[in-house]
Each structure stands twice: as structure tokens, then as C-alpha cells.
From Swiss-Prot:
This is Cytochrome c-type biogenesis protein CcmE. SUPFAM superfamilies: Heme chaperone CcmE. Belongs to the CcmE/CycJ family. Keywords: Cell inner membrane, Cell membrane, Cytochrome c-type biogenesis, Heme, Iron, Membrane, Metal-binding, Signal-anchor, Transmembrane, Transmembrane helix. The chain crosses the membrane at residues 8-28. Residues 29-149 are periplasmic. InterPro entries: CcmE (IPR004329), CcmE-like_sf (IPR036127), NA-bd_OB-fold (IPR012340). The keyword Kinase does not apply. GO terms for molecular function: heme binding; metal ion binding. GO terms for biological process: cytochrome complex assembly. One of its GO terms (cellular component) is plasma membrane. The lineage of its organism: Bacteria, Pseudomonadati, Pseudomonadota, Betaproteobacteria, Nitrosomonadales. The keyword Ribonucleoprotein does not apply.
Amino acid sequence: MKPRHKKMAVIALSVSALTVAVVLVLNAFQSNLVFFFSPSQVAAKEAPIGKSFRIGGLVEEGSLKREGDGTTLNFAITDTAEVIRVVYTGILPDLFKEGKGVVAQGKMADDGIFYADEVLAKHDENYMPPEAASALEQAAKAQKTSLAQ
């Protein structure tokens, strides 16, 4: 092979290897990407059904109920405008309480219930996840606007 052909072969091989690496990285990133939705967005059908996402807001007062097996829980997450029912099987974080901030990760089913795989509670008295705080503010503004009309 001539030096020019060797150089072109090396360049072609390098570009091919780089393309494969980029495709693998993007594929891994896509499979681990989890979006956040507020209860209002979920109620408006903006969240995907059957795909994993996070929902955040406040645990609705009086909504926490344990099933007979002791590990399955039913509760509702609200952003003060909409309420989404959640089912979770597992051990809840110690700071999980009604009326407090929470983020749940899981999938929305066709029956309108969010089946959580993971539940995250706030970690101190004043903390609320930024996404959940923003969703609560937007819901409050929307509620004020609808009342004013």
C-alpha cells in the first residue's frame, strides 16, 4: 500500500471507531434518561404511558393507605391543582410523610395509576426538589388565574 492509502485507511478506521463510540454512548445515555413531570402535566397526558419518568409534588393529606401485605402502599401526589394516585411496593424513606415533598420514579399504567419503583423524600425541613417546587408554583399561578376569570 502506498503511504497515501495507508493514511486514508487509518482516517476511515478512526472515523468508524469514533462513530461506533458515539452511538454506544448516546444509546446508554438514552436508556438512563429519566424526565420529571408534575401531577398537572401527567393529568394533561404529557407524560409517557409505560415509560419510566419521575413525578414530584406533595403527598396528599389522608391519602396514605397500606395494603394487607404491609409493603404495598397507595398514596397520592399533588401539586395543588391535580392529584395522581401512586402505588409503591417497598420500604419508604424515613422522612416520607403526608403533606411533605416527594419524588417518585416509575411508570404510568393505562389505568391512570402511577406504579413507583423508587420513592425519594426530602432530606431536611426546608428542602423541596427544584422541579417539584417549580411545579407547585406553576400550579398555584394557574389556579389563581382560573379563579380570577
